[in-house]
């Protein structure tokens, strides 16, 4: 009997040892993602800064590196897989895909097209038709501003030959308006006109949205990268849109995130907040109101493709369809 009890105790002890909890597995390594933003770090990228600083990317299992490049360079790098995901507008995506660069646009960030033509309040320019024979500063006959300018002029039955273009390849064209050397200039609705309006009378601003629905900046991915890192990319988009919603509700939160990322912005909080508030307006439209932030406007894409394909010296090298340009795989609805 004593032997039996001893055996039972030994078995119980063995059973307890066998039921011990295994040591926890180490957490998975975060997925490294290189995210391309516009050329100059600014308050306009506040949602990316907030998502990074608040830990939304980290909590989603991501190790995010934010880099700044010009739009055409980002398109190429994303197509090559050197950058995982980046901001680019539709007028860059269409020519790239038509030339065989394997990218897709998967989430809208700017629901409105940001490129505009603006003129000082005292310029005597009140309508697009008033631009005839006027000096307009712009970087060159290429890119999103050039396509936008052709759409605006065409709406008043004007062509680029009906105005005097003053080209600034170094992107200093805003200064020509400040110096009175140009009557108007191309720019961004959430930048130069905002700054001018803070310093004096609000400028005249011509937008293209009611003329041709050119597609604003959104997130593009390479096809191979999407296949290899789809889950991580979806997590990044979800975290970014979460931060976007928070900034819409509380712009000061976005401003603080931008200043933490770019301390020089603190030198003029009033201007930076005004720029951010103008930017927030451009993140939203009827499509995002109906379908949520990031939603893709397929009819708008088709209208843009049709317009760009019909331009003189069209940048569209070969016919493309909307399905070749877009992916629904980045938006986890």
Language-model regions: role of each:
Residues 1-9:
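Sec-dependent N-terminal signal peptides
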Residues 16-26:
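Bacterial lipoprotein signal-peptidase II cleavage site
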Residues 24-169, 174-179, 183-190, 205-207, ...:
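Short, glycine-/small- and polar/acidic-enriched structural segments
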Residues 42, 69, 87, 143-144, ...:
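Soluble non-cytosolic domains of exported or imported proteins
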Residues 91-92, 172-267:
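Pocket-lining segment of extracytoplasmic ligand-binding domains
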Residues 229-311:
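Secondary-structure end/capping motifs
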Residues 301-333:
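Conserved C-terminal helix/tail region of periplasmic/extracytoplasmic solute-binding proteins
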């Amino acid at each position: 009997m004593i032997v039996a009890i001893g055996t039972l105790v030994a078995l119980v002890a063995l059973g307890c040892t066998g039921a011990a909890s295994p040591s926890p597995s180490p957490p998975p390594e975060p997925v490294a993602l290189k995210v391309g933003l516009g050329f100059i770090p600014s308050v306009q990228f506040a949602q990316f800064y907030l998502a990074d600083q608040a830990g939304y990317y980290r909590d989603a299992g991501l190790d995010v590196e934010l880099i700044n490049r010009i739009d055409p360079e980002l398109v190429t790098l994303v197509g090559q897989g050197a950058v995982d995901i980046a901001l680019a507008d539709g007028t860059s995506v269409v020519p790239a895909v038509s030339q065989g660069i394997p990218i897709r646009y998967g989430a809208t960030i700017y629901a409105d097209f940001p490129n505009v033509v603006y003129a000082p309040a005292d310029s005597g320019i009140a309508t697009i038709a008033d631009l005839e024979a006027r000096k307009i500063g712009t970087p060159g006959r290429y890119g999103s501003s050039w396509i936008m300018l052709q759409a605006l002029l065409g709406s008043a039955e004007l062509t680029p030959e009906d105005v005097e273009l003053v080209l600034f390849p170094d992107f200093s064209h805003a200064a020509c308006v400040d110096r009175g050397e140009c009557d108007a200039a191309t720019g961004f609705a959430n930048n130069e006109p905002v700054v001018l309006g803070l310093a004096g009378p609000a400028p005249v601003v011509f937008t293209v949205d009611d003329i041709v629905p050119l597609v604003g900046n959104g997130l593009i991915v390479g096809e191979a990268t999407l296949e290899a890192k789809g889950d991580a990319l979806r997590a990044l988009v979800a975290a970014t849109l979460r931060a976007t919603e928070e900034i819409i509700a509380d712009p000061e939160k976005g401003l603080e995130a931008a200043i933490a990322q770019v301390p020089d912005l603190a030198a003029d909080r009033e201007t930076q907040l005004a720029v951010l508030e103008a930017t927030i307006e451009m993140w939203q439209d009827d499509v995002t109101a109906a379908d949520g932030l990031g939603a893709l406007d397929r009819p708008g894409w088709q209208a843009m493709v049709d317009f760009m394909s019909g331009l003189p010296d069209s940048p569209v090298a070969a016919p493309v369809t909307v399905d070749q340009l877009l992916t629904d795989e980045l938006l986890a609805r």
